[in-house]
UniProtKB/Swiss-Prot annotation:
Superkingdom of origin organism: Archaea
Family: Belongs to the UPF0282 family.
Name of the protein this chain belongs to: UPF0282 protein Mthe_0376
Record-linked InterPro entries: RibonucZ/Hydroxyglut_hydro, UPF0173_UPF0282_UlaG_hydrolase, UPF0282_hydrls
PANTHER family with a match to the protein in the record: UPF0173 METAL-DEPENDENT HYDROLASE MJ1163-RELATED, UPF0282 PROTEIN MJ1629
HAMAP family tied to this protein: UPF0282 (MF_01406)
Length: 294
């Protein structure tokens, strides 16, 4: 399979938009992008807004030419209700909009689904689906993070022959056992992982959450067929991310497993625009009127 990371936090936007191609089929997972509305008390810098616009065009272009779209939950960095044409006539696997879902996501799901009625919508939770050479499996809903405050997400496994990719969606770690179970059972060759939310360490993410996440990632490295772990999203909102999980990097090196972010996977340097927002405002000041408009 050909794996194309389109939009990720290491590429300057909030997203995990991923495209997979195999034998003439194209699958797009979570075709959406967004920006953190406030960071360090600052709105997105114009450089971030430019990146958002250019990246969305990339996502949209690949999504339009995809056969299958997957929506793992209803946050705006994972689905886009404002571009319903994107979904028209496509098979769309979605997180169940009525069960194991919090109020905010249920409301967003209702609006989203009212906009994409021309799509072939399939509830994905816990399901398995075949498309020619591809098999797509979904986990049961797992926490978005370490509790139910932000609702639930579904993890996805896509396989073609001996090649398999697991996409975790927003597990923020993974710190919880049931988030890890699906990964261990699927034993992918490539894991696209939403890593620990260390930029909130001590606030909405505890040292214990980080410890559990590190142990779980090491467990995955040591007990599956994984050869590449793409760790990104929440993890790449921390400018000091590389210093947070030294045990993971050591275990991966010992096991011959690559651990890297999406930008590095495609040969680019990480571009953590949100984490560098204060720096952006210092190096490229924004006029007072522009700031107010944001």
């Amino acid at each position: 399979m050909n794996l194309i990371p389109i939009a990720f936090d290491s590429l300057g936007v909030r997203s995990m938009a991923t495209c997979l191609e195999a034998r003439g089929l194209r699958v797009m997972i979570d075709p959406a992008v967004s920006l953190g509305p406030r960071r360090y008390g600052l709105p997105p810098h114009p450089i971030e807004l430019d990146r958002l616009n250019t990246t969305w065009q990339d996502v949209r272009g690949l999504a339009e030419s995809s056969d299958i779209l997957i929506v793992t939950h209803y946050h705006y960095d994972h689905h886009n209700p404002n571009d319903p044409d994107l979904y028209r006539g496509k098979i769309v696997y979605i997180k169940d909009p009525k069960n194991r879902i919090n109020f905010s996501q249920k409301r967003r799901a209702h609006y989203f689904l009212s906009r994409i009625e021309d799509a072939d919508i399939q509830i994905a939770d816990g399901g398995e689906f075949g498309h020619g050479p591809l098999t797509i499996r979904f986990s049961q809903p797992v926490y978005h993070g370490t509790g139910n405050r932000l609702g639930y997400v579904i993890e996805a496994s896509i396989s073609c022959g001996e090649d398999k990719v697991v996409y975790t969606s927003d597990v923020e770690g993974p710190a919880m056992d049931d988030q890890v179970t699906f990964i261990l059972e699927e034993s992918p060759r490539t894991l696209i992982l939403d890593g620990p939310m260390t930029y909130m360490l001590g606030y909405r993410y505890s040292e214990e959450d980080l410890r559990r996440s590190v142990n779980n990632i090491i467990k995955i490295i040591c007990n599956t067929s994984v050869k590449t772990v793409v760790i990104d999203h929440h993890f790449m909102r921390d400018i000091g991310y590389a210093e947070r999980i030294p045990e993971v990097y050591r275990s991966a090196e010992d096991a011959g497993v690559r651990v890297l972010c999406a930008a590095e996977l495609i040969g680019r340097a990480p571009d953590l625009l949100e984490a560098r927002r204060k720096e952006l405002y210092r190096s490229s000041p924004v006029g007072e009127e522009s700031s107010k408009q944001e």
